Amino acid sequence: MVPDSDLPKELLIELLGNRKEVLFVEGTEGSYDKRIYSALFPNCYVVPSGGCEQVINNVKAYNRTQSLHAIKAWGIIDRDFKTEEKLSALKENGIFHLKVAEVENLFLTEEAVRVLSQRFGADADRTYSSIKTYVIDRFSKQAKKQISEALVASVKGALSGITISDNEQLTADGIASLIDIASIEKNVNDRYQQAVEDHDYNEILGLFNDKSLVTSVGHYFGIDNKIYVDRAISLLEGDLRDELSEALRHYISH
């Protein structure tokens, strides 16, 4: 008999028959996420779960069925626009995050660029310097848009943390009094502007949400922009598994 669970019945049956640790990630069966995490964590059973919230829900739901198995589930989510407070709270529940904004940004990190430069026959120093300059310049030009998106996400996060009692009815003014929007705005602005001023490449990769970014750097390696990510993932799955795994795992919180 299959126990009650918030997980879909078919998925729960599939997982209960598995003997590996379960890793819930974002994305779909055909997405980059599953390929990347399956290569990085070959001893885990990787389950793409769609969005961030579904990853969180799946980890919690599966771990509530531990009376039936001895296997613990954990999760990895994109950093996106989440606050440090939110990320710390999730980590306590076994849900870790990338130190880059999106999984594709892993292939823009210095370590990955240097490893891949050698394979593609490009000069590692020149390639990394060119990509770093390009990414920082592009982030600077998009800073206002990125700040606006981060501000919206931060305010949504603050609103979702408000607890309302059964007999309480909040007005717009009441809600505004519960969150300090001015402070949130200042913190977001300061962080993004500081990253630009400092040319802090790692910080920018942690803030920059733009899925087209990684598809525009292939030419720096001497290959077509459109095939860079697929080539990089294929090498992660094959000939460069050890080198790239060591480079990329550094960018997953633990």
Label each region the model flagged.
Residues 1-84:
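RecA-like P-loop NTPase motor core
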